[in-house]
Amino acid sequence: MPRKHSEQLFRQAQKHIPGGVNSPVRAFKSVGGTPVFFHSARGAHLFDEDDNKYIDYVGSWGPMILGHNHPHVVAAVQAAVEQGLSFGAPTATEVAMADKVCELVPSMDMVRMVNSGTEATMSAIRLARGYTGRNKIIKFEGCYHGHVDSLLVKAGSGAIAIPGSPGVPEAVTADTLVLDYNDAASVTQAFKEHGDDIAAVIVEPVAGNMNCVPATENFLQTLRQQCDDNGAVLIFDEVMSGFRVALGGAQGHYGITPDMTTLGKIVGGGMPVGAFGGKQAIMEHLAPLGPVYQAGTLSGNPVAMAAGLATLNLISEPGFHQALAEKTTRLLEGLTAAAHAEGVAFTTAQAGAMFGLFFTDQNRISSFTEVMACDSERFNRFFHAMLDQGIYLAPSAFEAGFVSAAHSNDDIDATITAARKAFGKI
């Protein structure tokens, strides 16, 4: 499949854009090769600068649950644009959006709109610290919460955090405790040692940046119990899982109620939107009601709110998420059968319409350590074998995949057929 225009554009992009991309994973550094430059998308399909067509399982990294360019979402955006791009003032659309979010996510009494998932998690942590008067936070290895300094860390010696990126001073991460994902015992021990100082626990109930690793029920129940017993705030980062794992997010699926939730991706319908919210008692500490400051020039942007509201209304239709999950199951069962037919050690994970592909002989992956033990080089070869057949997967062994409502049975059948050939080559 020729991609000469992508190669030319990538060379040109590197002149003025660091690495030639505006977000690192897009550079194909994990899988090798040249990133694909796209010019348009419709439904479940992407079209690159050489007019090659791809079945898309990235979905702009999650937001495109309806598929690309859904006519109702496009119409809502066009109508909003005609009224003005931005006012920097309250609008009726942002009120309707807040009402809809709180309706769909019952744990959220109040919500504040922001411009990205990173901004949402950053603000939620600040608010939790302001509400509790404490400084320490717990996060889990392999969980990504945006490029916030205090959260961009990995586990060092024991639970002592060390910077995960140059430019992040150790002093900034000194109050961040990093524990193993799905390890309930480590959570209990951390609260035993630091309980009076822990402001919040932040967790992805479905970890989507170490591929796709759902939390165990016991793990989430332990988080809820320890936060209750010690007066800490439980934050579910549902930037990725929100409105995708289930209409009410992963928390609705698991039946575990957090104190705060962060949202992104689907909530903006493809526009740059994030949100954070939770219990009224906590949210009332946020300015202008309370002393914890947070602001944003483009927060609640009317065009973005129109896209998000149109998307949420469409995915609220009865049976939407069940049909999407069944479609995802059909895809994964087909991929697994294709791999095993070719003698390839392979397993999958699913959470609603999120999925993970693992090259391993283990039946289930539940921790960052297990993810790292998978054969990422074999994934890289699989990725390119699929790409050459017009199947666009996430260009990293550590990213989740997404199925949209626009994927047809023919799309899924074509993907499984391509996978059978790809498994045979790797």
Swiss-Prot record:
EC number, UniProt record: 5.4.3.8
Recorded metabolic or biological pathway in which this protein acts: Porphyrin-containing compound metabolism; protoporphyrin-IX biosynthesis; 5-aminolevulinate from L-glutamyl-tRNA(Glu): step 2/2
Example of a GO cellular component annotation carried by this entry: cytoplasm
InterPro entries per record: 4pyrrol_synth_GluAld_NH2Trfase, Aminotrans_3, Aminotrans_3_PPA_site, PyrdxlP-dep_Trfase, PyrdxlP-dep_Trfase_major, PyrdxlP-dep_Trfase_small
Keyword Cytoplasm: yes
Location relative to the cell: Cytoplasm
Gene3D superfamilies linked: Aspartate Aminotransferase, domain 1, Type I PLP-dependent aspartate aminotransferase-like (Major domain)
PTM-bearing positions, type N6-(pyridoxal phosphate)lysine: K265
Cofactor(s) essential for the protein: pyridoxal 5'-phosphate
Reactions accelerated catalytically: (S)-4-amino-5-oxopentanoate = 5-aminolevulinate
Pfam families on file: Aminotran_3 (PF00202)
Keywords assigned: Cytoplasm, Isomerase, Porphyrin biosynthesis, Pyridoxal phosphate
Example GO biological process: protoporphyrinogen IX biosynthetic process
One MF term in the entry's GO annotations: glutamate-1-semialdehyde 2,1-aminomutase activity
UniProt feature coiled coil, ranges: none
PROSITE patterns, per the entry: AA_TRANSFER_CLASS_3 (PS00600)
UniProt family annotation: Belongs to the class-III pyridoxal-phosphate-dependent aminotransferase family. HemL subfamily.
Subunit-level organization: Homodimer.
Record protein name field: Glutamate-1-semialdehyde 2,1-aminomutase
Highest classification ranks of the organism: Bacteria, Pseudomonadati, Pseudomonadota, Gammaproteobacteria, Oceanospirillales
